[in-house]
Amino acid sequence: MIISEPFAVAYALDKIEHSLVIDIGAGTTDLCRVYGTVPTPNDQMHINFAGDHIDAQIITEIQRKYAGAQITKDMARRWKESHSFVGGAAPDDPVIVDFSIEGKAMSLDITDCISAACETIVEPIVASVKELVTGSNPEYHDAFRRNVILAGGGSGIIGLGALIE
């Protein structure tokens, strides 16, 4: 039997009773409401707002702020993995990184770019959570809202759990 990754997360954590797992990977965010049995397709959602989307948004935000900025996907991914945050969870020090603008080496502040890029996944995730919760038995709505589990690489985004709540 093949099970979904979010269900595997809930099972590994022994949280298979009325949990809602949000597994933020590279290509997709997979959401699953867990009732204690293997979930059906109606208990799961998959959206394309995940790590790769954030990487692309970081590039877009930096190029919008710094015209001529030369950024690769790997650079954006490294910065995301080292500095990602949302909402009021900004780091104490600004996020200063090195990159080229029209061939000239620069060290520039991308704090607001990181935040804006990471926040682009919040609304699609919240909308999906609402859909899964409201589509479940009303008796379990509160339990699902109280038992949200973030998993995957995107779960490391500082402040994400609080913003989703």
Language-model regions: role of each:
Residues 1, 139-153:
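Short glycine-rich phosphate-binding loop at a beta-alpha junction
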Residues 1-22:
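Conserved phosphate-binding catalytic cores of ATP/NTP-utilizing and phosphoryl-transfer enzymes
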Residues 8, 131-138:
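Conserved helix-loop functional segments at active or binding sites
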Residues 12-15, 33-35, 44:
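Short acidic, glycine/serine/threonine-rich loops at helix termini
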Residues 21-29, 34-38, 50-52, 152-155:
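A short acidic Gly-Thr/Ser loop motif
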Residues 22, 122-123:
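Conserved mixed alpha/beta catalytic, RNA-binding, or beta-rich assembly cores of soluble enzyme
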Residues 36-122, 130, 140-141, 146:
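Phosphate-binding glycine-rich/basic clefts of nucleotide- and phosphate-handling proteins
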Residues 157-165:
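Catalytic phosphate/nucleotide-handling subdomain of diverse soluble enzymes
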